[in-house]
Amino acid sequence: MNKILTRNKFALPMPASPDYYSLPTESLPTLDYSVRLADLIEFKCFLESHGITTQNTRIERYIQYFEQVVVGVEAAEVSIFKNSQDERFKSKTDWLLYALREVDELMWILKGFKTHVPNGLADRLKDLVSGSDFAALDTNSRARNVEFELRIASYFCQAGYQVDLSTTTDIIALNGDFAFFIECKRVASASQVKQRLAEAVKQLGRRMPRKHLNRHAYGYVALDVTKVAYSHNGLTWGITPEHSKDINQNKLKFIASQIDRDVNSYATKGLLKCWLQIHISCLIANPPAVMSRFSSYYIENFRLGGHAIAALKSLRFVDAVSQNVPDERIWG
């Protein structure tokens, strides 16, 4: 089988990774763009069923864009996304990759909420539809912060948890035995990782009781570190799908190595687990393909006593959702 030598010069300092990747002999499974359009229309209907209008929002513009892509006419990106002019949008492929990144995240969110509709969802959806068309250009942090919260909530919904979005805590997720109080933070730079983690733990200290609804309560922090790994917050590429996956995982492992002691030190404050995630579009060379990657890495805190080990084991159902995604639009 053909092999190709790849040195990851774009990664942060990291443990050694495999130098060789086998070139695939088959194409990746992909979805027709008409599926994305159908998904967007379904998401629009979901929003409207919760009293959220999509007129003159980015949702409406995504639909306009994919309507043109699907029928095969030359998409008028500049006129559709009038406020998204930037040097990063140089080609049709750039526009497509950025749009796919947005749409695939929205579809992931919808997938969870079709399974379980959390309390307090409507108010979050109002914030979700605001903000810039593309995350790489967004200066409205509220909209993207909420989108990240809903992305994480979707995992718990898909894993069968009862999810509550109506409290001051970003997410409260319940299974039969435990209550997980989850704070979600988007991190803008490497220098902010420890700070954002500390902020989240401080919030948990104010908001999390020892028990909630007769369940033992534990703290959980989710950090979106996409901009730490990729300061441009834009697009990335890989020689093969495995190569692109390893790039993200190595970046996540390096970031985790900077805070694992901090996570352990927060055991006294009830922090059970820290979830690091990268969400980015990727262009694959062999075979030619585009994909949205949601790459995850977890730091588990084994210093908590009592029921903590059982609580960690119960969270593996959520981890499995992120690792086994039967969906051609999203790759872990």
What are the residue ranges of the model-derived segments?
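Charged, structured surface patches that assemble and position nucleic-acid processing machinery
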Residues: M1-S141, N145-Q158, K194-G332
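Conserved catalytic cores of phosphodiester-cleaving nucleases, focusing on short active-site segments
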Residues: F156, I171-A173, F178-A190
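Short, well-structured beta-strand/strand-turn elements
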Residues: A159-I171
